[in-house]
Swiss-Prot record:
<dbReference type="GO" id="GO:0008961">
    <property type="term" value="F:phosphatidylglycerol-prolipoprotein diacylglyceryl transferase activity"/>
</dbReference>
<dbReference type="Pfam" id="PF01790">
    <property type="entry name" value="LGT"/>
</dbReference>
<keyword id="KW-0812">Transmembrane</keyword>
<comment type="function">
    <text>Catalyzes the transfer of the diacylglyceryl group from phosphatidylglycerol to the sulfhydryl group of the N-terminal cysteine of a prolipoprotein, the first step in the formation of mature lipoproteins.</text>
</comment>
<dbReference type="GO" id="GO:0005886">
    <property type="term" value="C:plasma membrane"/>
</dbReference>
<feature type="transmembrane region" description="Helical">
    <location>
        <begin position="104"/>
        <end position="124"/>
    </location>
</feature>
<feature type="transmembrane region" description="Helical">
    <location>
        <begin position="140"/>
        <end position="160"/>
    </location>
</feature>
<feature type="transmembrane region" description="Helical">
    <location>
        <begin position="190"/>
        <end position="210"/>
    </location>
</feature>
<feature type="transmembrane region" description="Helical">
    <location>
        <begin position="218"/>
        <end position="238"/>
    </location>
</feature>
<comment type="similarity">
    <text>Belongs to the Lgt family.</text>
</comment>
<keyword id="KW-0472">Membrane</keyword>
<dbReference type="GO" id="GO:0042158">
    <property type="term" value="P:lipoprotein biosynthetic process"/>
</dbReference>
<keyword id="KW-1133">Transmembrane helix</keyword>
<protein>
    <recommendedName>
        <fullName>Phosphatidylglycerol--prolipoprotein diacylglyceryl transferase</fullName>
        <ecNumber>2.5.1.145</ecNumber>
    </recommendedName>
</protein>
<dbReference type="InterPro" id="IPR001640">
    <property type="entry name" value="Lgt"/>
</dbReference>
<feature type="transmembrane region" description="Helical">
    <location>
        <begin position="72"/>
        <end position="92"/>
    </location>
</feature>
<feature type="transmembrane region" description="Helical">
    <location>
        <begin position="24"/>
        <end position="44"/>
    </location>
</feature>
Amino acid sequence: MNEYFLLPLASLPFPNINPILIQIGPLAVHWYGVGYIVGILFAWWYAKRLAANPKLWPDGILPMKLEDLDDFIVWAAIGVVLGGRTGYVLFYDLPRYIAHPLDIFAVWQGGMSFHGGLLGVILAMTLFSIKRGIRTWSLFDVVAAGVPVGLGLVRVANFINSELWGRPTDVPWAIEFPNGGPFTRHPSQLYEALLEGLVLFVVLRILTHSRLKLKTPRFVGGAFICGYGLSRIFVEFFREPDQQLGYLLGTNWLTMGMILSTPMVLAGIWAMATAKPVKQAQPQAT
């Protein structure tokens, strides 16, 4: 039976939450923007807590000054926005932006790529750590540990916006999205919020505090990119592919998200497999 003609015995109505959290005159604050801002601020706050805890680091020596993280948040925000937008343009809708190049700057119309944002942050992190004399992987570890919270919030905002919904299904928890056509769908945004957000954060928390893996540079960062990649690939089996791309290579299952996430899994496995504990830490903080 064609999945697009399934008639579920029961489904859940869409909660129909206003995508605008606060409206003050012409100024509108959207849940999506709040998710990004709160996510960045939480990652910054959490990274400072990790970097300030001597029990988590080799010989109890902190890997960086807390002021470095205060300065890095600006670099990170720029990397997320520029990388996320550039990634979406290149990976998901290049023909459109070649035909209409000015639309690249119309970020209010939507269109951000996590994979592009990750590359943007990694570039910013590399340049920043070189400038400040910080071990790049240690910076990546503390930043990555708090990122899942922001990922989860943004996916919830995607759900509120009724965007990036899942494939048609007749499972009991299927959702009738207002712009999802005449069939019910997987709430794949919530699947991602659970896996990329809550589950991944808990896993990284265990690694940083119970397994003390911050003493092994790049292990936590590797676990993050591997964990995200695996979560994203899994959810892509339930998520509707981007309309302008559809399924790739003549299949009825392969998506761009899977292709972009596979190298992340491999890179994460490599990072964890080759990570070695620091024998003697170099003082960076006072």
